[in-house]
Amino acid sequence: MNKHKKIPLRKCVVTGEMKPKKELIRVVRSKEGEISVDPTGKKNGRGAYLTLDKECILAAKKKNTLQNQFQSQIDDQIFDELLELAEKVKK
């Protein structure tokens, strides 16, 4: 009998698409309220997943999607870091 390994799926908060966890990037808000990018997906706190795509990240910034998810202000530095990661993955 062939056993298939279960692939964890997560929903992108911008597009609403279910994708494999490895195709998405996690942004996390810690208990202290600090928001950071979590490339490993292991940090503690409230997480939100974004598709690692420039258009998706810019749409999240424009629509304030992450601010609504975390109910707190998001620095432009977080979006810059996400865009940088998207560029690295694209190459």
Curated annotation (Swiss-Prot):
CDD domains: YlxR. It comes from the Bacteria. Pfam families: YlxR. NCBIfam families: RNA_bind_RnpM. This is Uncharacterized protein YlxR. It comes from Bacillus subtilis (strain 168).
